[in-house]
Regions:
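N-terminal glycine-rich phosphate-binding loop for ADP-containing cofactors
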Residues: 1-192
């Protein structure tokens, strides 16, 4: 199936194919998305504009006040009124809703998806854990306000209070049919 994320991101093939055809293949070529250039005897890191293809010095010190909001959680960060927070919000809305669109086609076990993202990509939290930290209902409202589609499974989570809960000392996960089941972990597994 085709998911909305494909429409947003596309494959990027046209940019990449044009770069390869023009010899921009990385360090051994003319550069890539970034390149090191010498100016006045100093090495300067440059970034390629995805719209013009021109290089300009990469601004390593670009900071936004919202960068300090991350410690307060994703919800407060997404609410912060600056360009950095707006960028993060767009990425989170697209990425996390994409993960919810994949259930149950890829897996019906949100815990397995979260674990795979943490182990495979070194994320601190998986996509469904992030949605729970924002609040599933809050996240659904943000998607609606932005004009994005809301996956059915995400609607189920919003109506259920989230993807995870704790009952009788056991972590429970939401299933596509709306029921909660205990998260199964091997006995030898420890989590902190």
């Amino acid at each position: 199936p085709i998911y909305p994320f494909h429409d947003i991101v596309g494959t990027g093939e046209d940019i990449i194919q044009a770069m390869i055809a023009d010899g921009y293949t990385g360090r051994k070529g003319k550069g890539g998305f970034y390149r090191l250039n010498k100016e006045g005897g100093k090495r300067v890191k440059e970034a390629r504009s995805l719209t013009t293809g021109e290089y300009s010095p990469a601004d390593r010190k670009a900071t936004f006040p919202s960068a300090k909001m991350g410690k307060q959680g994703l919800g407060p960060l997404m609410d912060y009124p600056d360009e950095g927070a707006a960028f993060v919000t767009e990425i989170l809305l697209d990425t996390l809703s994409y993960a919810a669109h994949l259930v149950p086609d890829v897996s019906d076990d949100v815990y397995s998806i979260d674990s795979a993202m943490k182990v495979g990509y070194n994320w601190k939290r998986g996509p469904f854990e992030m949605i729970d930290s924002i609040g599933a209902s809050n996240f659904v409202e943000r998607l609606k306000t932005s004009g994005r589609s809301v996956p059915g499974f995400l609607k189920t989570a919003a109506g259920n209070g989230g993807f995870y809960s704790v009952a009788d000392g056991e972590i429970q996960r939401l299933t596509p049919d709306g029921s909660m089941v205990a998260v199964e972990r091997p006995e030898s597994t420890l989590t902190v």
